[in-house]
From Swiss-Prot:
Protein name: 4,4'-diapophytoene desaturase (4,4'-diaponeurosporene-forming)
One GO BP annotation of this record: carotenoid biosynthetic process
InterPro entries (UniProt xref): Amino_oxidase, Carotenoid/retinoid_OxRdtase, FAD/NAD-bd_sf
Recorded name of the encoding gene: crtN
Listed Gene3D superfamilies: FAD/NAD(P)-binding domain (3.50.50.60)
Source species of the chain: Staphylococcus haemolyticus (strain JCSC1435)
Molecular-function GO terms, alphabetical: 4,4'-diapophytoene desaturase (4,4'-diaponeurosporene-forming)
Length: 501
């Protein structure tokens, strides 16, 4: 069958490879000049910068795309484990190093608060059990029909997940030390949600890091996008770049998708898989005569969105290889207040930051004796935000806030004077480059009312031959999760093809 895939992000690339491996003719249409979507990369002044995701968790999910497509992961992607997860900076004189080695981790916990290891390990154990239930019965199912969700067994399993608690409440049940609570809670920001709003199941993120470890891909995260592209091409996938999809063609008589309008031209296909951000699809790509019934433009506007981010990609004329680790987190003095600012629309005065130094691990990504630095500051999305990112003064203020915070770290003292390359990325860039509604960095917020059956579906409930995958669809955001979205959606398509649907 001839299948169109809209979007060459990691979801579209992975799904296309899976479909092509089964013998189908797949064409990907990507509006930008390179593949990768949020997992893009750029080079500037001798530095190589990943633009979006940076942390490799659950490597088995990465490998599965290749192995289930009949290839060896190692032939496409060079990945290795890191012994160190991240450094946490609570203040300029208060740093905690988090290791994948349980003995070292226990020493760190006991140094932070004697006796805390038992509660921490019990947290990991209990959350791992929930993760296994969530993965098998929720994350890896498409919930095509109401009966697949609304049945006694599924609802019982959902209750076992205890999702009515938020992440903060769950963590507090196991850990009393405020620093350790922060260490666990901040990671819900990886998918753009407030830990006091996010269902407790999203506390799986620190568990995954501790149990499965954190890995690094040679050449940066873009190495995965390149590997997926090559995998697809080896199976015959065609990729058209600078190909702006303007409409999904719907046959109103038979209520089915049968093509796309791309750069003004009609292109016919047997099936369409759209991995563009779902809110954008609902509001901009569906024909006027054939909308998505449960996702009117008004409803899409009123849905809950994850936070956005302000990023600085900087080249530093300083060798930091022996002074910093690849992944680092710097906490605001008032972490709770910082979170409240983000989700109430305010620019943080004292932010929490995520710092990524890939050239510490991979010297090829920066000139000799220099270091590439990626800084992410969570900020409000554009609907909630009171921030005018078109104002150059506001951008300068955001930069000042970040550099002032960076300079509280000993290795980054007076860092501004050593910046030799700088690029910023604002919520407006998320909106324009990725068609992300309200500049949301992680798509729709995974609240209880926007999860599982209540999240935009992988199989259209309105039209035949139309499918959706990606961060704003089921099961949610984060690289392992969107790879799962690609998997279950491709499998649903193959099942429909097999049964003549």
């Amino acid at each position: 069958m001839x299948i169109a895939v809209v979007g060459a992000g990691v979801t579209g690339l992975a799904a296309a490879a899976r479909l092509a491996a089964k013998g189908h003719q797949v064409t990907i249409f990507e509006k930008n000049e390179q593949v990768g979507g949020r997992m893009s990369q750029f080079k500037k002044d001798g530095f190589t910068f990943d633009m979006g995701p940076t942390i490799v968790m659950v490597p088995d999910v990465y490998k599965a795309v290749f192995e289930e497509s009949g290839k060896r992961f190692e032939d496409y992607v060079d990945m290795k484990p890191l012994t160190h997860i991240f450094d946490i900076y609570f203040s300029d004189k208060d740093k905690v190093s988090v290791s994948t080695d349980l003995a070292q981790l226990s020493q760190t916990l006991e140094a932070t608060e004697p006796g805390s290891t038992q509660g921490f390990m019990q947290f990991l154990t209990d959350v791992y059990k929930r993760y296994e239930v969530a993965r098998k019965y929720f994350l890896e199912r498409t919930f095509r029909k109401p009966s697949e969700f609304y049945n006694p067994l599924t609802l019982y399993r959902g209750l076992k997940l205890k999702t009515f608690n938020n992440a903060n409440q769950l963590i507090d049940n196991y850990v009393s030390n405020e620093k350790i609570r922060k260490l666990l809670a901040f990671q819900t920001l990886y998918i753009g949600i407030d830990p006091k709003q996010g269902p407790s199941i999203y506390s799986i993120i620190p568990m995954i890091e501790m149990v499965h470890g954190v890995h690094y891909i040679k050449g940066g995260m873009y190495g995965l996008a390149q590997g997926l592209l090559q995998l697809g091409q080896d199976h015959g996938v065609k990729v058209e770049l600078n190909a702006d999809v303007q409409e999904i063609i719907i046959d109103p008589k038979f209520k089915r998708a049968d093509g796309l309008r791309v750069n003004g031209d009609i292109r016919r296909f047997d099936k369409v898989l759209c991995t563009a951000d779902f809110p954008y699809v609902a509001q901009n790509l569906m024909p006027v005569h054939s909308p998505l019934k449960n996702y009117s433009p008004e409803k899409v506007d009123n849905m809950d969105y994850s936070c956005s981010a302000f990023l600085i990609y900087a080249g530093i004329n300083r060798q930091l290889r022996d002074k910093l680790h690849v992944h680092n987190v710097v906490f605001a003095r008032d972490f709770r207040g910082n979170i409240d600012d983000i989700f109430s629309g305010k620019m943080p005065d004292d932010p929490s930051l995520y710092l990524y130094f890939p050239s510490v691990e991979d010297e090829a990504l920066a000139p000799k004796d220099q270091t590439g630095m990626y800084v992410l500051m969570p900020v409000p999305e554009l609907k909630t935000g009171e921030i005018d990112w078109n104002d150059p003064n506001m951008v300068e203020k955001a930069k000042d806030v970040i550099y002032n915070k960076l300079e509280t770290i000993e290795a980054l003292k007076d860092i501004r004077q050593d910046v030799v390359s700088e690029t910023v990325f604002t919520p407006l860039d998320f909106e324009s480059r990725y068609n992300a509604k309200f500049g949301s960095a992680f798509g729709l917020m995974p609240t209880l009312t926007q999860s599982n059956y209540y999240r935009p579906p992988n199989v259209s409930r309105d039209y035949k031959d139309l499918y959706f995958a990606g961060a704003s669809t089921h099961p949610g955001a984060g690289v392992p999760i969107v790879l799962t979205s690609a998997k279950i959606t491709a499998e649903a398509m193959l099942e429909d093809i097999e049964h003549g649907k």
